[in-house]
Each structure stands twice: as structure tokens, then as C-alpha cells.
Amino acid sequence: MAVISMKQLLEAGVHFGHQTRRWNPKMAKYIFTERNGIHVIDLQQTVKMVDTAYEFVREAAANDAVILFVGTKKQAAEAVAEEATRAGQYYINHRWLGGTLTNWNTIKKRIARLKEIKQMEADGTFEVLPKKEVALLNKQRARLEKFLGGIEDMPRIPDVIYIVDPHKEQIAVKEAKKLGIPVVAMVDTNADPDEIDVIIPANDDAIRAVKLITSKMADAIIEGKQGEDASVDFQEAAAADSIEEIVEVVEGDNN
């Protein structure tokens, strides 16, 4: 049975791609149709490819993989942080700092500085420092937490990266490829699927769509780590799903 149903995908708007003029021709095989200047993603393929991604991530988690969630645009930031945390993994949901993977030793030093400042507050050091210095330390901590808080406890370079919008996160994709780290990603109609190892054709601009797909990746991790079936609503899957349903919803949404 499918991990996710077409009904869920439709309700979350996963089928809406970008304007046709913004497409990447390499995504043609994942496009079902065009409606009012918008490409519509083939959700029958998405259902199958979510299954593939789920199994890939589940197996990685079962083998104690470190998995990094990446999504820095506003539509993805909250879901990426929440779902990575729920799965006991790590995330970057603000700007990707160049060298996060390829210059990991430098990043580790910045993380160590963040922990040092936190410890200074916890052990009472702040209380004996001048207010001006404490203010500067708090400012530094806030900035470090913003960019590195989600990977503060990441023990090593990740084994797998899950990305929302690889078109936006091209630096992260390039660093992962350079290091041979497999990338699982929500790939919209404007992106290059050739750069991604495990593709999920999906609308990466709608909050509900991002939350739905990202939550399934978190479920896969939880299942892999615990050996339990963490996903829900299997009974709603594939049985009544059809191309006709996509047409009906697409036309209804665009009237």
C-alpha cells in the first residue's frame, strides 16, 4: 500500500508546478498537463516516488544514518525544523552557509563557539562580565543559533540530505555531490532532476505541500529507527486514485 494517497497530495496542492515559461525541460516526464499557464505535476508518479524516497530514507535510518533536512525559504523553514526535530535529526532552515559540508571543520569551530557562549551563560560567567560585553555575546549567540542551531548536535557530516527546493539550495546540492552524499529532494517543475539522487516531483512552494512530504520523510526515519510503521492513512491510498481525479481537481481549482 502506498505511503501517501493521491487525495492527500491533491488536498495539499502538491500537483501545482510553476508557470510554463519557468519550467526545466528535464522535468517534462513528471508533468501531467498544463492548465492556465501552470504546469501540473503527474501525481501518479509522485505517489510512487514518495514510496521510493520513503524506503530509501527508512533504510538509511535503520542503519543509523545522520540525516540533514534543508529548506531555507519561508514556506519550508517551519516544517523542516519541526519534522527534523520530531525525527531526532538535524536541519538548516535559514541561509545555507557555503562550506557547511565541504568545510565542516570550520563549521564545527563555529558550533563550538555557540556552545561556549551558552555555557558562559549557564555557569554564571555573564553575571560578572560588563553589560556591553554580554550584549555582544548574546548578539553573537543569536546569529550562530539562527544559522547553526539545527546542526549544533550533528555528530558528523550527514549520510543523507533531504532538500526542499534544490533549485534554491544549489550550493547545498553541489556540496553534497562533491562529497558523494545522496540527496533526496522535493523537485518542482523549474528544477534540474539530474542533480538529485532520489526525486519527489512536487510543488515546493506551498506550505501544506512541503509539510506533507517532509512529514513523510520524518515518518520514514522514525520507522527505520524504531521498526514501527509511523505513517498514517494508508487506507486512503491508491484504491480510488486515478488520472480522472487529477483532471477533476485541476479543472475545479482553475475555474
Curated annotation (Swiss-Prot):
InterPro entries: Ribosomal_uS2 (IPR001865), Ribosomal_uS2_bac/mit/plastid (IPR005706), Ribosomal_uS2_CS (IPR018130), Ribosomal_uS2_flav_dom_sf (IPR023591). PROSITE patterns: RIBOSOMAL_S2_1. GO terms for molecular function: structural constituent of ribosome. The keyword ATP-binding does not apply. One of its GO terms (biological process) is translation. One of its GO terms (cellular component) is cytosolic small ribosomal subunit. Keywords: Ribonucleoprotein, Ribosomal protein. Pfam families: Ribosomal_S2. NCBIfam families: rpsB_bact. Belongs to the universal ribosomal protein uS2 family. This is Small ribosomal subunit protein uS2. It comes from Streptococcus thermophilus (strain ATCC BAA-491 / LMD-9).
